[in-house]
A protein has these predicted regions:
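Secreted extracellular polysaccharide-interacting domains
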Residues: 28, 49-71, 91-101
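Extracellular carbohydrate-recognition regions
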Residues: 13-30
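C-terminal outer-membrane/trafficking sorting elements
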Residues: 965-1006
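Short carbohydrate-recognition loop motifs
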Residues: 35-54
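Extracellular beta-strand ligand-recognition surfaces/modules
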Residues: 19, 72-75, 111-151
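Aromatic-lined, polymer-binding surfaces characteristic
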Residues: 204-478
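Extended polysaccharide-engagement surfaces of secreted carbohydrate-active enzymes
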Residues: 428, 435-923, 927, 939, ...
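Extracellular carbohydrate recognition and processing domains
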Residues: 83, 93-126
């Protein structure tokens, strides 16, 4: 037994080399070996290998070991970055069992740390020799490198950060390779001689991006200087360059967030001392920084920040940038290299075939500003110009429309994160806008197409948000857009008035600048408005089918409708966040009002939602929970859940100026990877027809079933309004104020109208379903846990479809910003049918008319309609027919909000093109050719019109009486094309389409 232990001990020593007294087992086939005290990473010596040209170094004679779970670890020092290739082969006898390619692309110490199962060959084997082969980029060059702290059979370091020395082998590594993968991207922009304009603009940028000077504190500076003097010793060469010094632990385990903060702030304190000309600070600063860089606290070192790490990098990176003015050019180059290493700078160099799939809004938010600083502050002008151009391209690329659910922008103007439209995460827009503003007036500004795409995204934020009424920056979204942060940061606009104004003033493209100024004036009336542009109103209906939502707005109100699909979740539930939020977007219809907080919209203002009935989300159809624990995924406060549909994708909107449609085939899944809730098998066809100031809601085919308790009703929720000082109006039912009296059931055999305290009116016709009205105090949990509750007074109402229903339906009308007298008048008109007519309400089609408008929500192919001129369609889509009696013209708008997702290897899924063919009664032709619309020659008294739908976008076309003398094309191509024109008014450019005028971003001019 003792012999076995001794043998084990000898084997362990034999596989470890520190080179303090010898270099046994190491033999240079070419060049020379020597123990050296010049550089070391352990003890006071290392092994120096000096050679010329291609050379080999062999390690043999140690006790063989099994290459399975353990790793090879060593420190390798390079006096300069050469780009040489060092091949390391692990042998069993003469057979090569593992091969590593180590690139000599750094200066100083770096780790060779690699598991034996991180190679092309991973079979079980014994290792009894190593062979190093150095292939220099210059065959005649003499090279020196140093080895230290070699452990051939080391314990694996699972937390190591592979440096850029592994750019050729990182695909084999089983740790986080994000940084080295970016470093492996080919730098495809050459360093060229800058133009006079580029040099001038570079100086402008350097002035704008100059880091903030570190704050001086005599105590902190003295403490930092004393620490360096007491803990750091360095030896310098005759020319002043660093030779060696105190060993610094640069393993990933040592470089914690706290240690990074300590190191960077210590450097800041010393830099502040240099600024104040404090004696000894310059020497301490240089000694400390030079030693850090030499020891591997540098580019390619063991430092990495996750792209969603928002604390540590915000301290470390600005601190490192702030010391640049106090660095020598060599120090600047290396510090900038470190900053690039940790701020994802390599993302600027994704290849043409990979960059689109790698857009990440977290990287934009966290790192874009630092990327731009690192580029501009490079001391070499030509390199700085090249680097700024790389960041400029990165910015332009990040405005591209990414297919599927990837970050960041979509064709309809929505911003994506976590695979869906997520306004709360579009704080990336702040960083992007700041970078755009930094580039103002320079030749490095992003191109017009990129600027326009980003401007459209900003415009979309303010279209979705409540109007200004109070604080200029207090804007809120519907709670259905709150993600996992309901009634808190998730519903607050994460963009500022100043930034929107900056985007307008910085814009170098005249037409686009005009539109941005108009958007700013419309979003912030009376707040430093631009006086050189025509007025613009945000009122109207908008569609965002990558959300999918409809937005209707007028005056001081905005209404938002939303539902989930199989690709876009309607609610995101995280550990300790939004635990009861699964119903946020179940066909929601939320009416909100401008104000300093959410109280004006009847929402809780406590940032937690405690006191809000999570069952009753306005507009939704839900199965009410009677036990809050059951409403959490798996009944816990930690399990994750994303609320998708159960495979259906027909949900979204059609907008045509002041009218529009929202529709959803709502199917609720209760699983996410695995079952998370007791299934209720909830289904419903839900639609909302928007006619300027009223919204007609129609539901059909509502069903629910399962083993859940019979005390859980299925309901379509009208509203919930939290009573507060800002929302203290009475609840009115059929003209009578309701006291806080608990619950009442309205007679379903008659029409009923209600006026919520927020001033939103509701009218319901006679129905077989009961209408429940509740007014009083309610105690409910916060969104974080069922253990914390709150009590609020609420007025709420919902349609009770019964416990488990089949084939239930509903109709109701929503009138925003009204009062009791107006609602009484509306109720009379709604009741006698003079305001609107529901023409069809079944599993295939919801159709509603008002005035000269007929809206169709086709849930499937349909035929046999006897109203209007539409007789059939071949697939699901939305359609609005507006008849102009004076010209006998039918003005159609159509879209398919179903993106028909198709699996894609690169993007997960992509939207696909679809077509639908309408059959119109009568003989019709297109008033003008329109892209994606093709009229067939009328036959047998009917006309077929084929529509092509892409990306959820609408098509607009006019049908006029067929004129045989006008001629008719033989192919679809003959009847397609785009006929729009530009119009200039007061020096401002607009687009005219279908007789309507739009800004260059597509916003209708009122």
């Amino acid at each position: 037994m003792l012999a076995v232990l001794l043998l084990s001990a000898v084997a362990g020593v034999a596989q470890t080399y520190t080179f303090e007294s010898n270099y046994n087992h190491w033999t240079a086939s070419q060049g020379t070996l020597a123990l050296s005290a010049d550089h070391y990473k352990e003890g006071t010596h290392s092994l120096e290998w000096t050679t010329t040209g291609k050379a080999q170094l062999v390690v043999s004679g140690f006790t063989a070991f099994s290459a399975n779970a353990n790793s090879c670890f060593m420190q390798i020092y390079l006096p300069e970055a050469t780009g040489d290739e060092l091949k390391v082969e692990f042998l069993n006898g003469t057979a090569v069992k593992r091969t590593a390619t180590f690139v000599c692309n750094y200066r100083g110490w770096r780790e060779f740390s690699r598991l034996y199962n991180e190679y092309a060959s991973t079979g079980s084997t014994n290792i009894n020799a190593l062979r190093f082969t150095l292939t220099p980029t210059d065959p005649a060059a003499t090279r020196r490198m140093y080895f230290d702290d070699v452990k051939l059979n080391a314990t694996a370091d699972a937390a190591r950060v592979p440096g850029k020395q592994w750019v050729k082998d990182y695909a084999y590594l089983k740790v986080n390779t994000a940084s080295v993968a970016l470093a492996a991207n080919e730098v495809d922009l050459e360093v060229q001689t800058p133009s006079v304009e580029e040099l001038a603009d570079l100086q402008t940028l350097r002035a704008r991006l100059k880091p903030e000077t570190p704050a001086y504190s005599s105590i902190n500076t003295a403490t930092a200087k004393n620490w360096v003097n007491n803990n750091i010793q360095v030896t310098r060469n005759a020319d002043g360059s660093l030779l060696n010094g105190t060993v610094i632990n640069t393993t990933h385990a040592a470089l914690t967030d706290d240690e990074l903060k300590t190191v960077s702030t210590r450097l800041q304190f010393l830099a502040a001392g240099i600024e104040k000309e404090i004696s000894g600070c310059r020497e301490a600063f240089d000694n400390y920084l030079d030693l850090l860089l030499d020891q591997g606290f540098a580019e390619g070192g063991n430092i990495i920040f996750a792209s969603n790490s928002y604390t540590a990098p915000r301290q470390f990176i600005p601190a490192m940038l702030s010391i640049l003015p106090f660095c020598s050019d060599r120090q600047k180059e290396e510090v900038i290299g470190l900053v690039k290493w940790v701020c994802y700078y390599g993302a600027c160099y994704y290849s043409e075939d990979t960059w689109l799939a790698n857009i990440n809004s977290d990287v934009v938010y966290l790192a874009l500003g630092w990327m731009l600083q690192a580029a501009a502050l490079n001391p070499d002008d030509a390199t700085a110009v090249r680097d700024i151009k790389a960041v400029q391209r990165f910015m332009e690329r990040n405005t591209a429309y990414v297919p599927g659910g990837g970050d960041m922008l979509k064709p309809d103007g929505t911003g994506f994160h976590h695979n869906t439209h997520y306004n709360n995460y579009m704080y990336a827009y702040q960083t992007f806008a700041d970078a755009v503003y930094s580039l103002r007036g320079t030749c490095f500004q992003i191109n017009e197409e990129a600027y326009a795409r980003f401007a459209k995204a900003l415009q979309s934020l303010y279209i979705m948000a409540t109007p200004m009424n109070g604080s200029a920056d207090a804007r809120f979204y519907a709670n259905s857009l709150g993600g996992r942060n309901p009634f808190g940061s998730g519903v607050k606009v994460a963009f500022s008035r100043t930034r929107l104004r900056n985007m307008a003033t910085a814009c170098p493209y005249p037409d686009l600048q005009t539109t941005l100024k108009q958007v700013y004036n419309a979003a912030f009336p009376g707040n430093m408005n631009f006086t050189d542009v025509d007025p613009l109103s945000l009122d109207g209906v908008y569609q965002f089918n990558y959300s999918p939502i409809a937005v209707a707005r007028k005056g001081n109100w905005v209404a938002t409708m939303r539902a989930p699909t199989s690709k876009f979740w309607g609610a995101e539930i995280y550990s300790g966040a939004n635990r009861f939020g699964r119903y946020q977007s179940h066909g929601s219809l939320e009416v909100m009002y401008g104000g300093n907080d959410l109280a004006a919209s009847g929402y809780p203002t406590n940032n937690t939602g405690a006191g809000w009935d999570w069952n009753v989300c306005p507009g939704t159809t839900t199965v009410h929970y009677t036990d809050w624990k059951e409403m959490m995924p798996n009944g816990t406060t930690t399990d994750r859940f994303d609320q998708y549909s159960n495979g259906t994708n027909f949900a979204g909107a059609l907008a045509a100026d002041s009218v529009g449609i929202f529709a959803a085939n709502l199917t609720q899944t209760d699983s996410w990877g695995s079952q998370r809730f007791t299934p209720t098998n909830l289904k419903a066809h839900k639609s909302v027809f928007i006619f300027d100031s009223i919204m007609v809601a129609v539901g059909s085919d509502i069903s629910s079933s399962g083993t859940y308790s019979d005390d859980r009703i299925t309901a379509t929720n009208l509203f919930q309004s939290i009573i507060s000082a800002s929302n203290a109006n009475p609840l009115i039912v059929n003209g009578e104020e309701v006291a806080e009296s608990g619950k009442q059931t309205l007679p379903s055999a008659q029409g009923n109208w209600l006026l919520a305290p927020t001033s939103t009116g509701y009218w319901l016709p006679e129905s077989v379903s009961n209408i429940e009205v509740v007014y009083g105090a309610q105690t409910t949990p916060s969104n974080k846990t069922n253990a914390t509750t709150g009590t609020l007074t609420a007025a709420k109402a919902y349609i009770n479809h019964g416990s488990k229903c089949d084939g239930a339906d509903y109709r109701f009308v929503v009138v925003p910003a009204t009062d009791a007298a107006q609602m009484a008048s509306w109720a009379k008109r709604f009741g006698d049918g003079t305001a609107f007519t529901v023409l069809q309400q079944d599993s295939k089609l919801h159709a509603v008319s008002r005035g000269n408008h007929i809206g169709y929500a086709f849930y499937a192919a349909a035929e046999g309609m006897t109203y209007g001129i539409v007789r059939a369609t071949t697939r699901q889509h939305l359609l609005m027919d507006t008849y102009d009696a004076a010209t006998k013209t039918h003005r159609f708008a159509a879209c398919n909000p179903n993106l028909e997702p198709e699996t894609d290897a690169q993007y997960g899924w992509i939207a696909t093109e679809t077509t639908a063919t309408l059959t119109l009664e009568g003989e019709w032709m297109a008033e003008q050719s329109v892209e994606n619309v093709s009229f067939a020659k009328p036959q047998n008294g009917t006309t077929e019109v084929t529509l092509t739908f892409k990306e959820g976008e609408p098509v607009f076309f006019h049908a006029v009486a067929y004129d045989p003398s006008a001629g008719f094309g033989d192919t679809a191509a003959d009847n397609c094309g785009t006929k729009v024109r530009k119009m200039v008014s007061n020096g401002q450019v607009y687009i005219v389409r279908d007789g309507k005028t739009y800004t260059v971003l597509g916003m209708a001019v009122k």
